[in-house]
Amino acid sequence: MFKKSVTYFGLPAFILFLLPIFLSTSLYAQVADTPWPMFRHDLQHTGRSPYGSIQKPILKWVFQTQGPVTSSPAIGEDGTIYFGSKDNKFYAITRDGKLKWAFETQGEVESSPAIRKDGTILFGSWDSHLYALNADSSIHWKYKSEGGIISSPAIAPDGTIYFGSWDKKLHAITQDGKLKWTQKTADHIVSSPAIAPDGSIYFGSGDYYLFAMKPEGKAIWSFGTRYLLDASPLIAPNGNICIGSEDAKFYVFRSDGQVEWTFDTLYDIDSSAAMDTHGNVYFGSGNNSIYAFTPDGKLRWSFETGASVSSSPAIGADGTIYVGSRDKKLYAFNPD
């Protein structure tokens, strides 16, 4: 049962609030030191910001594209906001919502961008390319896979870039776009890889498996669930790996691949989890609910919205949890 306060806001279209969930700093050498440089904020996918949360959101502006926006934005050092759209374009807009430039690809852009320390912006497209753009929209380089790229790139401290593709492979490429290695799975990879402090890479696959890889491309372990793993993993400070599956279960694994605990929501989980500074985990489910768990798997609270929750939560420095629902509302939860 939910104990404290909740605020929600109607979201009938793609609307950008200047929420502090996008205001953070990077802890990784090759990732830009910007407010929100990549999908889920950092390589461990905590979804957590060190900046304070707002008490009363004010709509500052709306930017209209020609297609749905499922790509999550990244924020550059100068405040530029980068994101993709299903209109085949990748956008750069100013902090006050004005268009700087739009880069056209040959496919929908659902991949969320990552910004490198040198300012290079990385993102994938359904045209099978991973693009590296300069800040003026010129192409630094591009890498071609054999399938569409929805997975969001992760930039390791050594500069290696990891991402999944519809070609059923996890790709590891150098910082100048050259192939290092691939790991073949039995189905598409939508899940965005998370990277542990020791360099281990974790990602889910459409073949129902969670994979753990070494930086040099050797498999550490894999675990089979009963359905798709399109959500992206979260890595806890103690090394545990947290991920939801479309088999309706939320899994927490130890770093050696052993299951620590699970929770059955009775409906698919596409939401990628977030973790607060106390180790509590938050995620949404197709059963319309948002869940909060303690690090050892005890249910703290749950809250039922008006529709399924595939949105991934983000957390402000004051602990406020932000998450959207298909009921067209953005919710802000008191952590207690």
Language-model region placement:
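Bacterial N-terminal signal peptides that target proteins for export
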Residues: 2-15
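Mature extracytoplasmic/luminal segments of secretory-pathway proteins
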Residues: 2-5, 21, 239
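Extracytoplasmic/lumenal domain signature
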Residues: 30-336
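Sec/Tat signal peptide C-region and signal peptidase I cleavage site
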Residues: 25-29
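Bacterial N-terminal signal peptides
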Residues: 12-24
